Curated annotation (Swiss-Prot):
It comes from Caenorhabditis elegans. GO terms for cellular component: endoplasmic reticulum membrane; Golgi membrane. This is Uncharacterized protein C14B9.3. One of its GO terms (biological process) is GPI anchor biosynthetic process. Transmembrane segments: none annotated.
Amino acid sequence: MAVVASTSDDFYANYAFESADRKDENSIRVPRSTEDNRRLKYGHAEDDNSDIAYLNFPVIVPSLVFTVISMGCFVGGIFTSLKSDYIPDERELIRGYVIEYGSSRFRCNTTIPFPADGLPSILNLFELNVIGNVLFRYAVCIPIVIRVFNALTIRNLLRHEYDKKFSSLHKVMADSMPIFTFVEAFMMSLFSIVTVHEDFPEANRFFKIVFAMSSVVSMLTTTTVMFAFSSNSESKWDTVSMIMKLISVVIYVYLMPQYMQYHQSSITFPICHSYMPQLFALMEYFIIIAYATFHLSFLIDIRNISFICFPRSSSGECEPIDPINFKKGAKYEHCRAFEYNQRRILSL
């Protein structure tokens, strides 16, 4: 009795084919029990059969579509807000003036002087201009599902490729990626909807604080896990993605607490114009660019991920979706897993 199959110590690997078996149709064994079937199928790895797949749809396609829509709405919101933005003079700020927000109007006055070197704040623009606010809502609400899906995909990809190298800490951090991604995306959508002047300032403040904290933790966690295994990748694209993440996370984590502290204090007072001191406005610009760059780098990470619908042999039955794959002489002429595996091992 000579062992032709796998030499693993696994229980099902101890099943052997007799070397005296002739390599013809009569040497194929038909299982008589579930245990026998498992033994005969031992070592069978299901091929993805991308060459004869019924469907091969890259995940990056819907991701790009949602990215273009989101970025387009965000940039469009900025331009429309700048176009309709009104800059009051000092007398109007003190005496008060009427601000139009869509069909509603409210009177605003403040004793805080207009910043001499001020620049428009993007968040304040969305706060005071209704079209910009609506486009901002589209930009952050539409891609929530695809963002969480991509985070789950990256988590599963990392755990699949580096499963044996994953420590308990790595597993916890990887599993937290989609959770923090959902929290930050959900909080961003909430503070885009709940405005300061029309709704609840304290709720807006809370949503922004939770967003800031969850986004920082999410970016640090994701970067740490992916950087831990980046040395195993030989692709230049993966290196580019890692560099984008590292630069973005350094900028974001350093600037976000400083900016958020000032922004939270400014919510306490009426927002009568979109301008803020130049330093904090520039901080906001860099934070937004870093945040966008970090999440755009995920498009590189998922570039090879696809939805594939393919013929299976593990089920024990042919899938008659495309009969050409199972005709005589085709790849799956013998599509039953136990038979396919024996023919592979015995080179029939």
